[in-house]
Amino acid sequence: EEAVTEMKIIARIRTELPEKFGVPRQSGLVPQLRGRVIFEPEYRNPDAVRGLEDFSHIWLIWQFSRAVREGWSPTVRPPRLGGNRRMGVFATRSPFRPNALGLSSVRLDRVELDPALGPVLHVSGADLMDGTPIFDIKPYLPYTDSHPQAAGGFTDGLAHAPLTVACDPALLEHIPADSREGLLGVLAGDPRPRYQEDPQRVYGLSFAGHNVKFTVDGDRLTVIAVE
């Protein structure tokens, strides 16, 4: 009889995005977006990350902790298809899946040994909300994990050009200096749902403790306030 192990949270990621709105749709889309992986006390032994600093990228296995539902549906409506077409849940990366697990490839910028927190992984390009629980971490292996000729299914040909972001430099001063490029990258990626195109609508994005308000007209996003 198979033994099914209950997964334990080994770490949580800290990012500037406390809400779902604004989180990049996939890892790597906003390489400027920084985060820190902080281990739970039980897993803060520096020996557990020995040698990890030699890898440029890592895999994070995590849970869509705010999307866990009872039961599941065999089909979902991918946002990339405008929410109008159903696909099999296992042919998508929808959070609404049986175990609500996510998989992200992120850049490992450095490993810090913090006196209080133990080993802290500084990463960039993550697509996770602040506080997301992480179940496992594995090194990215270029010789086996990279598939340049892979077919991307319904996502092939769906790439969208980034928006042009207009923002008064004085507004950006409200954001910590080392987080500004991440914010601009998130905005350029167009955080709006695909079906919302009203140029008069004002959107609010929670980022680094601030509410960033903006409008979008065509391919131009204008930041109107940072509160």
Each predicted region: which residue ranges?
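Conserved positions in beta-strands of structured domains
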Residues: 14, 106-109
